[in-house]
Amino acid sequence: MKGAKTVKIVIVVIVLAALILGYYYYLSHKSGKEQTAESVQVTAVQSVLMKDLERNYPPTPKEVLKYYCQITRCFYNEEYSEEELHQLAAKIQELYDEELIANKTQEDYLNDLKTEIAQMKQDQYTIASYDISASTDVEYFAENGRSCARMYCTFNLKKAGSTGTVASMEQFVLREDEDGHWKILGWELAEQ
């Protein structure tokens, strides 16, 4: 009898120990997963690159210009690899009209882009903010039977060590393609 009672006590102790160890294991793995999820942060560049324009193309000229500004801000304000630069360049070209893309070879476009980015970084300018025309300020018109839109965007540039910003207003012209997507046809500095 004594031996059977001892065996029961040993079994109960082993089961309790297994439950305690199992609960400890569960808690230690649970908090590790939460910490991993919290520590993964998406950079501004990665966030911009994750947008799938084939499935979720911006529906209005203003939204197209907003996404263009987000990419442009990444070019001048963020750190990125050479591969990410190429991906950003490809992503921004998805917003361009075919006619604009046809003006330069891909190689020339990338070289000009790299030169422009290097110059801005050398001059120590970043894009502090940007302001896009209100939707009510978009001027719609037709040219050669195609719908177009004209709107303005002001980039507020900040020089390192400076407290103020310099405004650079640009006028954009967008044209609707055969799929109903607004594409950037061109832009130029606007008179302020």
What residues fall within each predicted segment?
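A mature extracytoplasmic/lumenal domain signature
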Residues: 107, 134-136, 153-157, 172, ...
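Short beta-strand edge/turn micro-motifs at domain boundaries
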Residues: 33-43, 150, 164-192
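Amphipathic, hydrophobic N-terminal targeting peptides for secretion and organelle import
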Residues: 1-46
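Short, charged low-complexity linear motifs
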Residues: 9-10, 90, 94-95, 169
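Core segments of small alpha/beta cavity-forming domains
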Residues: 43-122
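Surface-exposed, charged secondary-structure patches
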Residues: 114-158
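Short low-complexity stretches enriched in small and charged residues
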Residues: 21-27, 45-49, 102-110, 126-131, ...
